[in-house]
Amino acid sequence: MALRHWRAAFEAMEVHMPTFVLLTRLAPDAVRSPQALERLEREAMRRVHAECPDIEWLNNCAVLGPYDYLDIFRAPDVETAAKVATLIRVHGRAQTETWAAVEWDRYKELVRGLPDGVIVATGQE
């Protein structure tokens, strides 16, 4: 009975791979038309999923500022995230920057576990 209870509890746990944020800036001559942009996206995603089948793509956005795109994905480890960034960089003739991220609810859980007196810097001081 105890084993069955433990197994059910384990299966109910939501275990996520690490989350990564990928910022991408395309080379100025990489895309010359909307159709070329769509082809580039399809081919880049095909290559990424073929080489890194374990990733989970969560979201992608066009952004204003020094980068063109912001993508959020989960990968089993930092090496796989680096491979994703490299594939995007090479295939899309792009510059990339990759950040590890902690989802906000999980971050709050982590902070709650800190000892009293620890100052949590949020950049909002």
Labelled PLM ranges:
Residues H5-P53, D105-E125:
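Short S/T/G/P-rich N-terminal loop/turn motif that feeds into the first structured element of a domain
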Residues H16, V63-G65, V90:
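A generic structural micro-feature
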Residues R25, L70-R74:
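Short hydrophobic/aromatic beta-strand micro-patches
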Residues R47-L70, W99:
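Short, glycine- and small/hydrophobic-rich beta-strand elements in well-ordered beta-sheets
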Residues Y67-L70, W99-G113:
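Short secondary-structure transition/capping segments
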Residues A75-D105:
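An amphipathic, aromatic/His-enriched active-site/gating alpha helix that lines ligand/cofactor pockets
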